[in-house]
Amino acid sequence: LLKGVKELGFTRPTPIQADAIPPALEGRDLLACAMTGSGKTAAFVLPILQRLIDTKRGTTRALILSPTRELALQILEDINDLAVHTPVTVAAVYGGVGMGPQEHALRSGVDIVVATPGRLLDHMKQPYAKFSGLEVLVLDEADRMLDMGFLPDIKRILRHIPAKRQTLFFSATMPAPIAALTREMLHDPAMINLARKSAPAVGITQAVYPVRQELKAALFLALLAKGDMREALV
């Protein structure tokens, strides 16, 4: 595993990797707010690979849920790069392609499955999709899955996998439905918040004018009269 990391040119962990990998290696649940491009994929892949290197092959032990086919394929590529010198096997399960090769991977008990929710549920209707030995569940970009309407699918998937497992939950934002889902899924999680703080767009200047309620209209008209604004949206 270290050889693969070295060949990829990794010399020091990113902040999310430094914060997430230790509790993940300890087997703790994890709730992490981190943006795309922060290195979060390696933050959950490396602990999974470390856990699975010496386990018996033939049983799917890790499931990674992704909102899109493109992200699933990127995660698959990252796992293959990191696991190149290990016996760990991985397959991606997503829509828009035939189910045959995916069925073969599930029948063989590939170690790690990276999947989009809809296609995974299609397979879960069949007896060959067995997840009784699952040890680790990862939700990547959970807020995007919410935006795409996958929350009911995620809840259905949870009914097909063991309740006793490690869950690693990654989301760039934490809207109320996602926060509620974390309370259902996670047990005493390690909490990491590296989400980018909101900032005004480039070229936008923000200002605050403390003013009494009865003077708001007069202040607004005075600001417009100054002529500093070419366009205004109220």
Feature-to-residue mapping (PLM):
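Residue-level signature of catalytic and energy-coupling elements of molecular machines
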Residues: V5, Q17, A32, I48, ...
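Conserved interdomain hinge at the start of the Helicase C-terminal
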Residues: G203-V234
